[in-house]
A protein has these predicted regions:
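Glycine/charged-rich beta-loop-alpha catalytic/anionic-binding loops adjacent to active sites
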Residues: 80, 108-113, 136-146
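Short, Lys/Arg-enriched N-terminal segments with co-localized hydrophobic residues
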Residues: 8-28
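N-terminal glycine-rich anion-binding loop in soluble enzyme alpha/beta folds
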Residues: 33-96
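N-terminal glycine-rich phosphate/adenylate-binding segment common to multiple enzyme folds
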Residues: 96-127
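Mixed-charge interfacial surface used for oligomerization/domain docking
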Residues: 31, 39-47, 52-53, 58, ...
Length: 232
């Protein structure tokens, strides 16, 4: 059975399983894993050390496609951007999300996925679709997909705090509920050297980019309550 609750998908467990940890008053703790995407900007070592799963967005630059297996070094990436190259990103599609989720389901684990803001990408929706499809194939498992309404280390902070709760013994529903209730407390404040990159990537309006360039103004940007990038 599936239910939409406060913006995330929850596929309820249909039966109790043996062999799981037991919480207070005999409640059987279901084993689960936290997953996210690489927009959280967490180090690769973090995913390995804490057992957090990650799905990766790909990008194209100068006609060449780059995926997780062949991402160019960061220094080279930004050197190309300064020289005028513009990367275009591709959102995670449902099959990508399914490839991340399904192995954990086969291991008997439930999944809490904290996704890149739906106001900046279709990645959240792709993960939600994959979760709905997998709920039919694995009715005994649970998948919760949370729209973080955040990006970069704002999203990464939510992932880290959720993982900390998990490691301290919180169950998946409790961790998901806390994440959902506190995600709008994340504050993003930053600026960039060149607004044209954000404009060409569809992240800020043409007016913001043109005026900022003409006046040599670098506005402070933030992510609003709808998960969209706007200047203050």
């Amino acid at each position: 059975m599936c239910k939409i609750y406060k913006g995330f998908l929850l596929s309820f467990q249909t039966q109790k399983e043996k062999g799981r940890g037991t919480d207070r008053e005999g409640y059987i703790m279901k084993d689960y894993i936290i997953t996210t995407d690489n927009n959280a900007d967490l180090p690769e070592e973090y995913y390995t050390q804490h057992g957090v799963g990650c799905v990766y967005l790909s990008y194209t630059m100068d006609g060449k496609h780059y995926s997780h297996e062949n991402f160019m070094p960061v220094e080279e990436f930004y050197a190309k951007m300064r020289a005028g190259s513009l990367p275009t990103t591709a959102q995670v599609n449902p099959s990508d999300a399914r490839a991340l989720f399904e192995p954990y389901l086969k291991e008997g684990k439930d999944i809490l996925h904290i996704a890149f803001s739906s106001g900046l990408s279709g990645t959240y929706n792709s993960c939600r679709i994959a979760a709905q499809e997998l709920a039919e194939d694995y009715p005994e498992r649970s998948i919760i997909v949370v729209d973080s309404l955040a990006a970069s280390l704002g999203q990464g902070l939510l992932v880290h705090l959720a993982q900390k709760m998990k490691e301290e013994g919180a169950d998946m529903e409790e961790t998901a509920r806390w994440t959902e209730e506190h995600k709008k407390n994340i504050v993003h404040l930053f600026t960039v050297d060149d607004l044209n990159h954000l404009y060409r990537g569809g992240r800020v309006s043409r007016t913001t980019a043109v005026l900022g360039g003409m006046l040599n103004i670098k506005p402070v940007l933030h992510v609003d309550d709808e998960g969209k990038l706007i200047p203050i």
